[in-house]
Amino acid sequence: MRFLKLTLSIVLGISLWSCKDKTTSKNTISPTKTLANNNTSKTKLFSDVFEFVNYNDDGDYRLINLRKNNESFSFINDKNDDRSLVRGDKVAIEWKMDTIHIAGDGETPELAEWLVSFKKIKEGKLARFRKTYKLDFKYHWYNENEYSDGYFKHLYELVEYYVANSKNELLKLHIADNSPLEYSIEQQERDGKTYTVLGLGTSFEGRMTKIQWLYYDAEKDDLYEYDLPNDKLVLFP
């Protein structure tokens, strides 16, 4: 298989949090590494099975982001308007090599992977979780942090994904009991890096009990569990 690794300038294209700068950053595609060669036929179809991560419709090209064997891959998704996939779904896709033009680089043509077709072959844990847990998560944040509606939505989906896939036994008990969950949102510095920190837990009589702290790196779109006994962040797959 030949893949073009598409590098995303990901302040997530959905106008992330910012207290001072409220401009919207968009994903751009940088031709940093390509395994496609210029003689690759544009009519040849490739196929494989991936795990769906998310859609990104905010750049010069719409993207579908997928994962396989702990590696991330992005495909041009300009010819597909279906947005029915949920993170964690297994999908069989077909793609081909075709031309894109890199913005800000003199419109230089490059080969990239274009999605041709996809078929969901298995629901992920998040899709199954949504069918059984019918409560909405509540959330609150500190007023000094300003977040866009798109960022709130993205954080909500991250928390859903975490809850659906978490091995935290206490959290599993609350889900089994259909207990309401909520989370706090704040910004924190750790080791010189800014994270959005989510305090996930339950409330009783106005008092919140935290079950798990989550750290989100918006630049890399990485979610971490906080390991309290060892005071370290553990990447959540």
Regions found by a protein language model. Name each.
Residues 180-216:
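Exposed beta-strand-loop-beta-strand "reactive/processing" segments of non-cytosolic proteins
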Residues 15-18:
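C-terminal motif of bacterial Sec signal peptides marking the signal peptidase cleavage site
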Residues 79-94:
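Short nucleic-acid-contacting surface segments enriched for D/E, G, S/T with interspersed K/R
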Residues 134-184:
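Short, non-transmembrane alpha-helical segments in secretory-pathway proteins
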Residues 20-22:
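Bacterial signal peptide processing site
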